[in-house]
């Protein structure tokens, strides 16, 4: 059953299609759903979006890593997970393929839209997390992305000349089983999603699983557009090489060297408000505030970046909504029925073993 978020906040907007001076909408989550925003001119629309951001900022959020936070994340589908619930069917992918002119796109009703995770593996992962197992492990790719997300964010702020607000987990105001953790939302109401790929080439086309992530984020926040920012960042070994770089963005990250009992790497970044200071001058100034030998400089350059604006597609979401609901029902069923989960887990393991044996046999046949 879909549960409604009862958090309400009044907002007044002028209705351009009537002679009334204004209309009062008690719940700003509903203003988009009721189509009111489509009646507003540019200025009034911007005012609404700014109010919408204020409403989102006031929404209560569980303290990160608290029992409530873990329970919420483990019992809903989040935007970054949604691609693991869907397949590359026409219903899911046709609009994406047309939008980016992917004429050779291959539809497949059984293949996951997340090339890194199949649906059955995702269901098992959610059940393990629900039961207290640690299922989230960083790779060199995720660590790189985390390391340079702040650099990309400051680049975006400087380009767009705007402020970006941070958010934790935003639950959908109506669909209680859906949530999102965007990288930020601008004061003008534009969602921001940041990716800093370590090896993947930036093409100007958002990969399918990230496009799905952004669409779900927009749904959860009831916003109309997002900027998908990708940055190709390379590290530089020496100051001399760094100093020779001209005409492309570059900078320095200060790496706080780990204490023996501290496994978490810490960094200090030059923020957007400090951008007028030359990075080396900034880093040396910060270094004077730190204990000698407790830090090092990491020089970097931004070789390439891309900002792709993605519009919210309500029709697309309606096409995939039932698929997401069905996966969520499976997750909650297995989370609350251990014996059934054990059967499911064993059946998936058996299928994988059979597939593995089949692949070995096929390889042997090819060798013969």
Q: Predicted regions span which residues?
A:
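Accessory terminal regions of nucleic-acid processing enzymes
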Residues: 1-368
């Amino acid at each position: 059953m879909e549960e409604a978020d009862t958090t309400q906040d009044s907002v007044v907007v002028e209705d351009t299609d009537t002679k009334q001076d204004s209309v009062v909408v008690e719940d700003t989550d509903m203003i988009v759903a009721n189509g009111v925003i489509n009646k507003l001119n540019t200025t009034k629309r911007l005012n609404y979006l700014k109010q919408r951001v204020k409403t989102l900022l006031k929404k209560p959020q569980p303290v990160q890593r608290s029992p409530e936070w873990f329970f919420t994340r483990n019992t809903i589908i989040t935007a970054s997970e949604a691609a693991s619930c869907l397949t590359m069917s026409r219903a899911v992918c046709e609009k994406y393929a047309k939008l980016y002119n992917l004429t050779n796109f291959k539809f497949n009703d059984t293949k996951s839209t997340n090339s890194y995770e199949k649906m059955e593996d995702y269901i098992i992962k959610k059940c393990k997390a629900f039961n207290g197992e640690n299922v989230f492990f960083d790779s060199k790719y995720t660590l790189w992305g985390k390391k340079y997300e702040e650099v990309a964010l400051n680049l975006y702020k400087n380009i767009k000349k705007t402020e970006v607000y941070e958010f934790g987990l935003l639950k959908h105001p109506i669909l209680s089983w859906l949530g999102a953790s965007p990288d930020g939302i601008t004061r003008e109401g534009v969602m921001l999603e940041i990716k800093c790929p370590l090896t993947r080439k930036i093409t100007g086309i958002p990969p399918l699983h990230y496009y799905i992530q952004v669409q779900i984020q927009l749904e959860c926040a009831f916003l109309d557009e997002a900027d998908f920012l990708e940055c190709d960042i390379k590290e530089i070994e020496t100051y001399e090489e760094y100093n020779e770089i001209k005409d492309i963005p570059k900078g320095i990250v200060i790496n706080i060297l780990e204490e023996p009992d501290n496994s978490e790497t810490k960094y200090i970044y030059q923020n957007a408000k400090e951008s007028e200071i030359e990075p080396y001058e900034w880093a040396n100034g910060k270094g004077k505030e730190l204990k000698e030998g407790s830090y090092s400089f990491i020089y970097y350059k931004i070789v390439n970046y891309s900002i792709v604006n993605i519009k919210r597609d309500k029709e697309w979401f309606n096409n995939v909504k039932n698929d997401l609901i069905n996966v969520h029902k499976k997750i909650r069923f297995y989370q609350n029925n251990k014996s059934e989960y054990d059967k499911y887990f064993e059946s998936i393991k058996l299928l994988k073993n059979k597939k593995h044996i089949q692949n070995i046999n096929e390889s042997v046949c090819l060798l013969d």
